[in-house]
Design a protein with these regions (language model features):
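Single conserved hydrophobic/aromatic residue that forms the stacking wall/gate
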Residues: 1-7, 295, 299-303
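Active-site alpha-helical elements of protease catalytic centers
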Residues: 132-146
């Protein structure tokens, strides 16, 4: 159900991800575990459906918060639909780098970033290319730089660096890696995700998306305090950002993960200017042609 419950403005901007081919993994059960039809509906329509079947949406939402809640069939509803689909198959790739640890080589840290974006939209007038400079060339650059730095030191645990495919198509690359890892997933002690490192400038804080998800935040807070900085929990948890990036594929398997994001409290400009910068990106660049090299390189030049 959309609207404010999952951030209606994000749903509108994400429509670029809904056009064209819709991708999925080639599953062993040939998709039989999936619903016949999956869709989103507005809150207004949801209320109408619940009322029509004799239920109250708000009341059931409260009841569903109890862990003993059981799903049930809403009788008296039917849907007639005709969908014509052409199915084709192709391969894409996750890239994995590996540095073996010294004393605990069978334990792993994993640093991840998705390398894909949205491609080209020939229906647009003018610029048609979705460059994805911030989302997520910056994240890939961060993982590459971390790999370069880790290559200069010896670590007790092994370190995995991965650039993941098809994040924008439903976190498919990370889902595949989490389901079929070339390493023992139970021995991954920490996973770090870099998804969109905005060039907003130096900050006094660091945002943690999904605050409270793992004890890795405690280690981050300890290091930030050494720099005179602090953790700023996600100010918009209702948007569900924690569930919309690659780390969640590993979190669902029990891997402790940390998804940190740009801080809001800018050294020059404070929190107000920080939120202005994020508003500019989210509303005028995110999943659009303006998320381009000029945006990221201009900020880098200022540094």
């Amino acid at each position: 159900i959309t609207d404010s419950l999952v951030g209606s403005e994000m749903c509108i901007r994400d429509r670029n991800s809904w056009t064209g081919p819709q991708l999925d993994l080639q599953r062993k059960d040939l998709g039989m575990s999936r619903s016949i039809l999956e869709s989103w509906i507005s809150l207004d329509i949801a209320n109408e459906i619940f009322t029509y079947t004799g239920f109250n949406y708000d009341s059931l939402k409260e009841i569903a918060l109890d862990k003993s809640f059981q799903a049930f069939e809403m009788k008296g509803l039917s849907l007639t639909s005709k969908i014509n689909s052409d199915i084709s198959y192709f391969s894409s790739h996750n890239l994995i780098g590996y540095k073996e640890g010294s004393s605990k080589p069978d334990e792993y840290l994993i640093f991840m970033a998705h390398w894909d974006h949205l491609g080209i939209n020939d229906e647009l007038v003018g610029d048609k290319v979705f460059n994805g400079a911030a989302d997520n060339a910056t994240g890939v650059a961060a993982v590459i730089e971390l790999a370069r730095k880790f290559d200069q030191v010896q670590t007790e645990r092994s370190v995995i660096f991965t650039a993941l495919t098809l994040e924008e198509s439903g976190l498919l690359g990370s889902a595949y890696l989490a389901e079929s890892p070339p390493f023992d997933l139970a021995n991954v002690v920490a996973g770090f995700n870099f998804d969109r490192v905005l060039p907003t400038g130096k900050t006094k804080d660091m945002a943690v998306i999904g605050y409270g998800a793992s004890e890795l935040e405690d280690y981050l807070e300890e290091e930030l305090q050494k720099q005179g900085r602090y953790i700023n929990p996600d100010p918009n948890p209702e948007k569900g950002y924690f569930y919309r990036s690659d780390h969640i594929s590993f979190a669902k398997k029990g891997v402790p993960v940390l998804y940190s994001d740009d801080g809001f409290d800018l050294v020059e400009g404070g929190i107000e200017e920080g939120f202005n910068e994020i508003y500019d990106y989210t509303n005028f660049r995110y999943h659009g042609v303006n998320d381009c090299l000029l945006y990221t390189s201009d900020a880098a030049d200022e540094e």
